[in-house]
């Protein structure tokens, strides 16, 4: 599949909008073509590590375009307190990579989940470990490393304030990843370098009043065969009205819930 195919698929709904607008004039939803393009983007945008193209220069304008999209994300009280720090300097990328590796080494010593052999996560562990090892070795080679941050600190805040703070920056970071993907650019969602956040802040002159939420190594990706990941069935973790209650499907029109333990 050619690289342009993905972008074409994502844009096909907009191209067809003019011809289908009359048909869907009374609906608040997207047309089938638009919905298919959006669903494809949402279900196939992956954290890219092994397939980041380390040799191809990255146009800064693509990052800026993706940020323009990202800041349309929800923000509590319309505060818009997010910040995007783009690092392309080779020496700084090398220093960031050192902090990332130090954080990764610490992470490896932490207790790991023990998934059962029939759990899809068990089968995915080796592949994810290999992907992480590749980024561990090559992080300093990516064209750009982007940090998404927000004003304020959360360490001493109550749960509601912490939720509000992260809820006002993480949607923008995810939108940034989606916008990059639509432009043929990949990113890896990682927080391991933040184990040493204060050292990172000193390296990049980040004020003490700022919280860094995520680090995103960014590069063009190779190939175009991204597909949905194997996930646990969401029905097992979807509740209605009360935690642990699932929707009763015995009646065609029933929305009652049954409690499941």
Task: Show which residues each predicted segment covers.
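Bacterial N-terminal signal peptides that target proteins for export
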Residues: 1-8
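Small-aliphatic-rich amphipathic alpha-helix that forms the alpha element of a beta-alpha
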Residues: 65-71, 144-148, 152-203
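Glycine/small-residue-rich phosphate/adenosyl-binding loop
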Residues: 86-167
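Cleavable N-terminal signal peptides
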Residues: 12, 22-23
């Amino acid at each position: 599949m050619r690289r342009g195919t993905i972008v074409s698929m994502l844009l096909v709904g907009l191209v067809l909008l003019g011809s289908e607008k009359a048909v869907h004039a009374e609906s608040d939803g997207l047309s089938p073509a638009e919905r298919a393009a959006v669903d494809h983007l949402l279900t196939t945008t992956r954290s890219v590590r092994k397939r980041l193209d380390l040799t191809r220069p990255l146009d800064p304008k693509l990052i800026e375009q993706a940020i323009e999209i990202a800041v349309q994300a929800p923000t509590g009280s319309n505060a818009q307190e997010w910040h995007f720090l783009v690092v392309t300097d080779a020496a700084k990328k090398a220093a960031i990579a050192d902090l990332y590796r130090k954080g990764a080494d610490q992470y490896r010593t932490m207790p790991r989940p023990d998934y059962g052999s029939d759990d899809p996560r068990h089968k995915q562990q080796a592949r994810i470990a290999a992907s992480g090892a590749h980024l561990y070795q090559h992080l300093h080679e990516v064209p750009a490393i982007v940090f998404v941050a927000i004003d304020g600190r959360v360490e001493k805040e109550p749960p509601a304030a912490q939720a509000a703070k992260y809820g006002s920056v993480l949607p923008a970071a995810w939108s940034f990843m989606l916008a990059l993907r639509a432009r043929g650019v990949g990113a890896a969602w990682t927080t391991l370098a933040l184990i040493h956040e204060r050292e990172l802040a000193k390296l990049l002159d980040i004020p003490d009043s700022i919280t860094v939420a995520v680090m995103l190594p960014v590069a063009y990706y190779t190939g175009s065969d991204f597909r949905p990941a194997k996930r646990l069935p969401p029905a097992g973790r979807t509740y209605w009205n009360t935690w642990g209650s699932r929707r009763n499907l015995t009646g065609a029109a029933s929305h009652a819930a049954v409690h499941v333990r």
